[in-house]
Amino acid sequence: MNTVGGDIEAGLALAELLSGMRKPTVSLVLGGGHSIGVPLAVSAKKSFIVPSATMTVHPVRMNGLVLGVPQTLSYFDKMQERIVRFVADNSSMKSERFRELMTATGELVMDVGTVLDGEAAVKEGLIDSLGGLSDALDCLYGMITKEKR
């Protein structure tokens, strides 16, 4: 995958679809797995990332008309919790650590969040392994072979 992110609802729907599959699934982050790309990347049974790829973890954002009422903040909090819970359930990263990275200040200019390169994503437990296309395909074929037994 290589994505800058996008619609939260659509991204979470796809991530839930992938994580719920009984068939072998493998993800590979090439370039970037930013924003809602993070849940998509961890939704596979096994995830890989190339060393030069990056992943941006940040709080929920919205553009357009936003009503300045308590219900809006509550909605954002619930949406953010859905993402945190999904990532924690589908990776080795604890929810507390994901929240820390999501709300970190000082790394992104005029923004909140964290950018992880391939090594950092694996070290943090967000992604399973460093590797490229051959590694991802070998893993997938291995899963298929194991399932056939």
PLM feature segments, named:
Residues 1-38, 42-149:
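N-terminal organellar transit peptides
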